[in-house]
């Protein structure tokens, strides 16, 4: 017997029908929700990350790197205007 007296062993949990009924619904649902979150662009909007087609512009074809840590805000403004 493992753990505290009132704990069920993990082997009992993963071999139960109830576990698989619940998880056969929740695991695919989480996968689909994550896929929709990224594919609709909502993840980019919420976290402020540039979309894959916004990393490089017509004028700037090199990677937008911040090189001066003390003037980082100015560099970000300059890179976002290009």
From Swiss-Prot:
BP terms from Gene Ontology: photosynthetic electron transport chain
Gene: psbE
Organism of origin: Stigeoclonium helveticum
UniProt cofactor note: With its partner (PsbF) binds heme. PSII binds additional chlorophylls, carotenoids and specific lipids.
Lineage: Eukaryota, Viridiplantae, Chlorophyta, core chlorophytes, Chlorophyceae
Swiss-Prot/TrEMBL cofactor(s): heme b
Molecular function terms from GO: electron transfer activity; heme binding; iron ion binding
Protein name: Cytochrome b559 subunit alpha
Keywords of this entry: Chloroplast, Electron transport, Heme, Iron, Membrane, Metal-binding, Photosynthesis, Photosystem II, Plastid, Thylakoid, Transmembrane, Transmembrane helix, Transport
InterPro entries: PSII_cyt_b559_asu, PSII_cyt_b559_asu_sf, PSII_cyt_b559_CS, PSII_cyt_b559_N, PSII_cytb559_asu_lum
UniProt subunit comment: Heterodimer of an alpha subunit and a beta subunit. PSII is composed of 1 copy each of membrane proteins PsbA, PsbB, PsbC, PsbD, PsbE, PsbF, PsbH, PsbI, PsbJ, PsbK, PsbL, PsbM, PsbT, PsbX, PsbY, PsbZ, Psb30/Ycf12, at least 3 peripheral proteins of the oxygen-evolving complex and a large number of cofactors. It forms dimeric complexes.
């Amino acid at each position: 017997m493992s753990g505290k007296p009132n704990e069920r062993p993990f082997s009992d949990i993963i071999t139960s029908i109830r576990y698989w009924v619940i998880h056969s619904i929740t695991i695919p649902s989480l996968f689909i929700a994550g896929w929709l979150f990224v594919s609709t662009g909502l993840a980019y909007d919420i976290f402020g990350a540039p979309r894959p087609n916004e990393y490089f512009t017509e004028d700037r074809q090199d990677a937008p790197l911040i090189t001066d840590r003390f003037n980082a805000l100015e560099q970000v403004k300059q890179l976002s205007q290009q």
